[in-house]
Amino acid sequence: GLVRLALGRGRFFEAPFVEFDAYVDRVIQQSGVFYRLIFVHRYTQKSFHKTAFSTIESSKSEVLALWDVLQTYMDVTQPLPDVPRLEPFRHLDPVTAEHDLRSGRNPRFWRDLDLEAWKQGEGKEWLKRQMEYPWDKRQCRLTPQLGKISMAEYRKLRPADAWPI
């Protein structure tokens, strides 16, 4: 699918999702080291670090999990990621609707969830699995370098006339 990112002043940059490489950027602040996802268009070297998906996170695994969710979301052969934000739309996607029917997924799972109980039980387990997941061993289908090169190293490799990061 296509990605459309705002450049400001009513201008947009649009390109196929597969043309974007994702990088984890370390953000050093007074309160500690944080992480965010940066998108770089492979052919123009334009970088985007102020998107809805570039929030600063305290955990690198949270950023890597977000990239995994985005790849799943953009892959039309897979069901939509099972996240609260997408639940109201799952029935509109044929692949997801079929998957949910086969798996017996409650169409209101997230909306009817007792959040506090979930945080103490299953949610706590999900977070633990995400934190312990061997992200560095996983081969990213779209961006094989994710997590293998730092943003500082990437900046050094960029052409001098590339879009500034």
Label every PLM stretch briefly.
Residues 2, 116-165:
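Alpha-helical transmembrane spans
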Residues 3, 9-29:
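Phosphoinositide-dependent membrane-docking surfaces
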Residues 3-4, 38:
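Residue-level detector of beta-strand face positions
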Residues 13-18, 52-54, 114:
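Short, solvent-exposed coil/turn linker segments
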Residues 96-125, 129:
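Eukaryotic phosphoinositide-binding membrane-targeting regions
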